[in-house]
Amino acid sequence: MANYFNTLNLRQQLAQLGKCRFMQREEFADGCNVLKGKKVVIVGCGAQGLNQGLNMRDSGLDISYALRKAAITEKRASWQKATDNGFAVGTYEELIPTADLVLNLTPDKQHSDVVKTVMPLMKQGAALGYSHGFNVVEEGQQIRADITVVMVAPKCPGTEVREEYKRGFGVPTLIAVHPENDPKGEGMAIAKAWASATGGDRAGVLESSFVAEVKSDLMGEQTILCGMLQAGSLLCYDKLVAEGTDPAYAGKLIQFGWETITEALKQGGISLMMDRLSNPAKLRAFELSEQLKTLMRPLFEKHMDDIIAGEFSRGMMADWAEDDAKLFGWREETGKSAFENAPAFAGKIAEQEYFDNGVVMVAMVKAGVELAFETMVASGIYEESAYYESLHELPLIANTVARKRLYEMNVVISDTAEYGNYLFANAAVPLLREHFMPTLKAGDLGASKAEGQSVDNLALLAANEATRNHPIEKIGQVLRGYMKDMKRIAVGG
């Protein structure tokens, strides 16, 4: 199979990268009625598979799970989760032939085998759904001409898809129809109904393309969402301990610091996050973030270029063929890092202390979010897509670090995201260790500086204006208007 994106001419590539429209609430007035009375069969019962299924069933749809025969006879975790939640479970041969909509919600590396298995079993005119377009775009999966191919991609982990639905809300979602597979022109109606059934229409839906979703998703998760959190955690912990900070305190400051800092980001963007700092600290964080952006821009651009060209996918799929040798090796290295093995800290850290003692962490978040956004937009991805794949998802990923450090983050994210995270962090850590961390001053990380520092009013004004007028702040203000009911997610400590 050939990389689908690379088979397109430049005009087609730009058109698909730039496909992005924020859909109006009234476009979902029909809810999920298009799928009422239809048979929806989900393949895969992981975080997205189970939680989307629960939401869709609660929305009145007929949901069942198709699993491999071995998973059923051996009562594996997927079978256990589906049956524990009262779903009908059967083999591919039992359920796929009568399905009107088959949702392939398995991990990326399984998509090709799953599609090859289920496609001959699917009835004429059925639909096939994805929540990530890697198989279609990067692997170039060819789908039977009579099958409609759609995507509904919630912009958060599966657990949050369920929790927000239970609150009567939802999570922002991208939907798309594969232009090569919409024989009856029904794709958009199916995608809208699926998104509505998961609750996505309550939080905002972008009409996108498979191409735009894949390229922006890969970029976000490799850089700011996972790669920067991994690199920043390892570097900041080592710096604190090297300068005499109690390892237990350092571990807690980093583990819960990302979550606390990005909670402000979630509620009011970069501006609110920066406003949580004192004026001298805000100026310093702005200065550090500009330094980071200059230093790291080539690395961000390299990752975007490799994603666009298909180099990243080629490298990762080569590792699949080697039984994930690189992935497992990098995972083991992370598990042995000093931060991952830091002792527990019994004391309390006040919320403001995370900001006051984590000025460089704020700078890393600001620089990473802005760089990821700028790099995606410069590559033809629209601002709305770039926002969701950078700033919006960051608090959700930071929350996983707060639970069980980097181990939890790398367990929750996909193997594709984990592989990309290591690629980025493995380059970012030595770069920042040599050229950035030695430039830090007293008060940038750890104990904050004493009060009484002077502030240049004009410098503060310029920093505030630059932050608030960044394009991600402007589009973020609009998109957050559709998410006014966002709950706090910080687990704190």
UniProtKB/Swiss-Prot annotation:
Q: What is its EC number?
A: 1.1.1.86
Q: Which cofactor does it need?
A: Mg(2+)
Q: How is the cofactor bound?
A: Binds 2 magnesium ions per subunit.
Any one GO BP annotation for this protein? L-valine biosynthetic process
Q: Which residues form the KARI N-terminal Rossmann domain?
A: 15-208
Q: Which Gene3D superfamilies match?
A: N-(1-d-carboxylethyl)-l-norvaline Dehydrogenase, domain 2 (1.10.1040.10), NAD(P)-binding Rossmann-like Domain (3.40.50.720)
* Superkingdom of this protein's organism: Bacteria
| Limits of the KARI C-terminal knotted domain | 209-344, 345-486
- In this chain, Mg(2+) 1 is annotated as bound at 217, 221
Q: What does this protein do?
A: Involved in the biosynthesis of branched-chain amino acids (BCAA). Catalyzes an alkyl-migration followed by a ketol-acid reduction of (S)-2-acetolactate (S2AL) to yield (R)-2,3-dihydroxy-isovalerate. In the isomerase reaction, S2AL is rearranged via a Mg-dependent methyl migration to produce 3-hydroxy-3-methyl-2-ketobutyrate (HMKB). In the reductase reaction, this 2-ketoacid undergoes a metal-dependent reduction by NADPH to yield (R)-2,3-dihydroxy-isovalerate.
Family to which this protein belongs:
Belongs to the ketol-acid reductoisomerase family.
Q: What is this protein called?
A: Ketol-acid reductoisomerase (NADP(+))
Species of provenance: Aeromonas hydrophila subsp. hydrophila (strain ATCC 7966 / DSM 30187 / BCRC 13018 / CCUG 14551 / JCM 1027 / KCTC 2358 / NCIMB 9240 / NCTC 8049)
